[in-house]
A protein has these predicted regions:
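Flexible, solvent-exposed loop/hinge segments and secondary-structure transition points
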Residues: 21-161
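Positively charged n-region of N-terminal signal peptides that target proteins for export
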Residues: 1-4
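Bacterial N-terminal signal peptides
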Residues: 7-16
């Protein structure tokens, strides 16, 4: 009887987990990712800069990466790292940097996971208060990267209402 209850509970939990995965994939659909990429590119052209742009799922795993124009080669690794960091911490990378400063609660977090970056430009994406993914932007100044990221987050929020 105990085994039967355990097996039933496991089946229910597996179903719930799979449903959550499907919902996440539905939210970060190819179509939505394309629209977010277009928004990032549009804003970067408005600012007159070439950027790299990444989207990660809620686990920080890559969903999309785009390098526009002559964006810095460094951005090839840095920008996906921004998206990863924002996803796994559920915070803007700029905020993670503050929390990782000497004496702060997360001091040294970046030494535990080489994918963590403390460079501004990573923003989490939430739907109904739940993390569904994150974006990373790089190629401009800190202010430009954040301006583009905030623009894309606003587009995302409008499209997922």
């Amino acid at each position: 009887m105990k085994r039967l209850l355990t097996a039933g509970l496991l089946a229910i939990l597996t179903t719930i987990f799979c449903m959550a995965q499907v919902n996440e994939r539905e939210i970060l659909s190819d179509e939505l990712c394309d629209k977010m990429c277009a928004a990032a590119h549009e804003k970067s052209k408005e600012l007159g800069i070439d950027i790299s742009f990444a989207i990660a799922d809620r686990h920080g795993l890559p969903r999309v990466y785009r390098r526009y124009g002559d964006a810095l080669v460094l951005s090839i690794t840095l920008v996906p790292g921004k998206a990863y960091t924002a996803a796994v911490t559920q915070c803007k990378t700029k905020d993670v940097a503050g929390a990782a400063a000497e004496g702060a609660p997360l001091m040294g977090i970046q030494t535990n996971d080489p994918r963590i970056t403390l460079v501004a430009g990573g923003y989490p994406l939430f739907v109904d208060g739940k993390i569904v993914g994150a974006i990373g932007v790089g190629g401009g100044t800190e202010a430009q990267d954040c301006e583009i990221a905030e623009y894309v987050v606003n587009v995302f929020e409008e499209l997922t209402k």
